[in-house]
Amino acid sequence: MVNVPKTRKTYCKGKECRKHTQHKVTQYKAGKASLFAQGKRRYDRKQRGYGGQTKQIFHKKAKTTKKVVLKLECVVCKTKAQLSLKRCKHFELGGDKKQKGQALQF
């Protein structure tokens, strides 16, 4: 289980900063796919009418996890950066810190 704090002091590449500043951490989430991207328009046109499925649907999935991507926003200049972490099954943002000698809780 990976537990990441909601703020982190790290280097900012923004023109005003270019030094270590406080950053607000959120988890990256993919945006909604556009209906007007060239590949989607081509695919929709190919799918029209009779003839069933025209392109293969991928079934041989190999990975069981995705890499976690953090979105870092500078508190000073609002510049955003992304940082990818290793793969993990359980990810937590701003959870309680671990304490020595405590029993495991799920």
Curated annotation (Swiss-Prot):
SUPFAM superfamilies: Zn-binding ribosomal proteins
Family: Belongs to the eukaryotic ribosomal protein eL42 family.
GO CC terms, sorted: ribonucleoprotein complex; ribosome
Annotated keywords: Antibiotic resistance, Cycloheximide resistance, Ribonucleoprotein, Ribosomal protein
Protein's name according to its UniProt entry: Large ribosomal subunit protein eL42
Transmembrane regions listed in the UniProt entry: none
Gene of this entry: RPL44
Organism listed in the record: Schwanniomyces occidentalis (Yeast)
GO molecular function annotation: structural constituent of ribosome
GO biological process, one term: translation
Note in the entry: Confers resistance to cycloheximide, an inhibitor of polypeptide elongation.
InterPro entries: Ribosomal_eL44 (IPR000552), Ribosomal_LSU_eL42 (IPR053708), Ribosomal_zn-bd (IPR011332)
PROSITE patterns: RIBOSOMAL_L44E
